Amino acid sequence: TAMFLAMHYTSDIATAFSSVAHICRDVNYGWLIRNMHANGASFFFICIYLHIGRGLYYGSYLYKETWNVGVILLLLTMM
């Protein structure tokens, strides 16, 4: 969905809001693509948080190197 949204989105501060409105109003099923993208991203981060919770529950934080790599990957994912 990100590729379809990127074809119509502009990141310029003056036109960003109007490009989102264009996606929702003028692109065929643009509202659906936008909602699927938002819900998919939310579900992705919920899965990441569940994975972190599982690691905390099973004590994986004791493996310092593995845990630090995971934290770095989480921060890179959020950028």
Curated annotation (Swiss-Prot):
* GO biological process terms on file: mitochondrial electron transport, ubiquinol to cytochrome c
Entry keyword set: Electron transport, Heme, Iron, Membrane, Metal-binding, Mitochondrion, Mitochondrion inner membrane, Respiratory chain, Transmembrane, Transmembrane helix, Transport, Ubiquinone
In which residues is heme b b562 bound?
Answer: 37
Gene3D superfamilies given for it?
Cytochrome Bc1 Complex, Chain C
User: What PROSITE patterns is this protein classified in?
Assistant: CYTB_NTER
**Annotated heme b b566 binding sites:** 51
Subcellular localization, per the record?
A: Mitochondrion inner membrane
Misc. comment: Heme 1 (or BL or b562) is low-potential and absorbs at about 562 nm, and heme 2 (or BH or b566) is high-potential and absorbs at about 566 nm.
* Name of the protein: Cytochrome b
